[in-house]
From Swiss-Prot:
Organism: Arthrobacter sp. (strain FB24)
Gene name for this UniProt entry: nrdR
PROSITE patterns xref list: ATP_CONE
UniProt keyword annotations, A-Z: ATP-binding, DNA-binding, Metal-binding, Nucleotide-binding, Repressor, Transcription, Transcription regulation, Zinc, Zinc-finger
Domain ATP-cone positions: 46-136
PANTHER family cross-referenced by the UniProt entry: TRANSCRIPTIONAL REPRESSOR NRDR (PTHR30455:SF2)
Family named by the database record: Belongs to the NrdR family.
Name of this protein: Transcriptional repressor NrdR
Lineage, broadest ranks: Bacteria, Bacillati, Actinomycetota, Actinomycetes, Micrococcales
Note on cofactor: Binds 1 zinc ion.
Cofactor(s) needed by this chain: Zn(2+)
UniProt function note: Negatively regulates transcription of bacterial ribonucleotide reductase nrd genes and operons by binding to NrdR-boxes.
Zinc finger (unnamed): 3-34
Alphabetized GO MF terms: ATP binding; DNA binding; zinc ion binding
């Protein structure tokens, strides 16, 4: 690592810490030549391959902007959108791949968005999955209803269990 002050090609790591919720490493470095300290931030690169075949760096802000449109008029805050984008990025990075197709990013958005707001989920899914008819919406809604019923039954079963004490 070159010193930004004297351009010496060596530097010594003084301190390392996790940054950005574990997706980056912040290192404090010191130049042995001039003695000055500087900070570097190391992240792994994550490239999104678009349909055209062009690659571009993953962007949380693009995820937020895309989901924000689906959330217009819904009780979803900017903090909710930021948390969703973070969850999407963590899911994608957990795959360990350096490159991911844009389609996979969209799939990674669907599950956390469904948990956040079902109406926004339907809006996003209708565009992302190219709904073409009312039947497509009806199918998606019936799946949401079925999942809600299953969750309600599971929650009811847990609350009716008696404590062994």
């Amino acid at each position: 690592m070159y010193c930004p002050f004297c351009r010496n090609p060596d530097s010594r790591v003084v301190d390392s810490r996790m940054a950005d919720d574990g997706s980056a490493i912040r290192r404090r470095r010191q130049c042995p030549e001039c003695g000055r300290r500087f900070t570097t931030v190391e992240t792994t690169s994550l490239t999104v391959i678009k349909r055209s075949g062009v690659g571009e760096p993953f962007s949380r802000s693009k995820v937020i902007n895309g989901v924000r449109k689906a959330c217009q008029g819904r009780p979803v805050t900017e903090d909710d959108l930021a948390m969703l984008a973070q969850e999407v990025e963590e899911t994608i990075r957990a795959s360990g791949a350096a490159e991911i197709e844009a389609h996979e990013v969209g799939l990674a958005i669907l599950s956390p968005l469904q948990k956040l707001d079902e109406v926004a989920y339907l809006r996003f899914a209708s565009v992302y999955q190219a709904f073409e008819s009312l039947e497509d919406f009806e199918t998606a809604i019936s799946i949401l209803r079925h999942e809600a019923e299953v969750e309600a039954k599971a929650a009811k079963g847990k609350s009716s269990e008696k404590s062994p004490l």
